[in-house]
Amino acid sequence: MSTLRVDTVMTTELVTVGPDDTLGEVREVFDTHRFHHLLVVEHFKVVGVISDRDLLKHLSPFVGKLSERAQDAFTLQRKVHQVMSRNVVTIRADTDIAQATRLMLDHGVSCLPVLDERQHPIGVVTWRDLLKAVAHCGLDPLCRLPNSAA
């Protein structure tokens, strides 16, 4: 029986950051793109994930406000490696979405980097992607999503 796979729901447009990039640079990426998670990549390998929630948690709430002080602006200079999640749970593109969902629930994560056979990132699957698939297909394993290949 055919099942919905991660490669039918994952985002393949990857925007990555490096561990030595600043939170200011990450903020610009989040402002420019409609992502909630960025992969932190070094030498073509995923070394971490940073989310928009991580960014908000580590930036001063006064950045960009009239009451901003030097120490508030300094939070923009913090490095990604200081705040990223390091224990990254990854997945393969040919994994079914039920297993992806179990991995997210078991590990308490909201995204899974999708890696190829060389362990290089080729996409990201998020809880939103999985929820959209269920909303569109229900539990029908033969369902085809509008943007899926095959």
Regions found by a protein language model. Name each.
Residues V17-R34, V40-E42, H81, T90-G108, ...:
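The conserved cystathionine-beta-synthase
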Residues H37, F44-K45, L66-R69, L76-R78, ...:
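Short, surface-exposed, polar/charged, turn-prone segments marking secondary-structure boundaries
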Residues M1-E13, S51-V89, D96, T101-L105, ...:
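Tandem CBS (Bateman) regulatory domains
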Residues F30-H33, L38-D54, M104, L112-R128:
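A glycine-centered beta-loop-beta connector
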Residues E13-T16, K45-V46, T90, H120:
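Short, flexible active-site loop motifs that bind/organize anionic cofactors or intermediates
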